[in-house]
Regions:
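Compact, glycine-rich, soluble single-domain proteins
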Residues: 12-59
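Short beta-strand element of the conserved SAM-dependent methyltransferase core
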Residues: 9, 38, 66-68
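Short amphipathic
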Residues: 3-13
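C-terminal structural segments of small proteins and small subunits
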Residues: 59-92
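SAM-dependent methyltransferases
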Residues: 1-3, 92
């Protein structure tokens, strides 16, 4: 059994986790051999679900927890955290 890794990250882009940002997150999450989940205010969704991510309503200033379990859990956490910290490559 593998350990579940978690990382908490702040949403810092102006539009938050909207459709385009969610699509980028889902696309990246799907590249890893890991089960990835995102939690906000006690609600947890599959990181490969655009609708699930959007339903979290994670706007500017919100805090989300990214968790992953599986062979590539550490890589998934690092890459997804970087994507969020880079504001989904939307703001330069």
């Amino acid at each position: 059994m593998t350990e579940r890794l978690t990382r908490t990250v702040d949403i810092s882009n102006q539009r938050g986790l909207h459709a385009r940002a969610s699509a980028k997150f889902v696309k990246l999450a799907a590249t890893f051999d890991a089960e990835v989940k995102v939690t906000k205010d006690g609600s947890t969704v599959d990181a490969r679900s655009i609708m699930g991510l959007m339903m979290l309503a994670a706007g500017l200033g919100c805090c989300i927890e990214i968790s992953a379990e599986g062979p590539q859990a550490a890589e998934a956490i690092e890459a997804l955290t970087q994507l969020v910290e880079d504001r989904f490559d939307e703001e330069r």
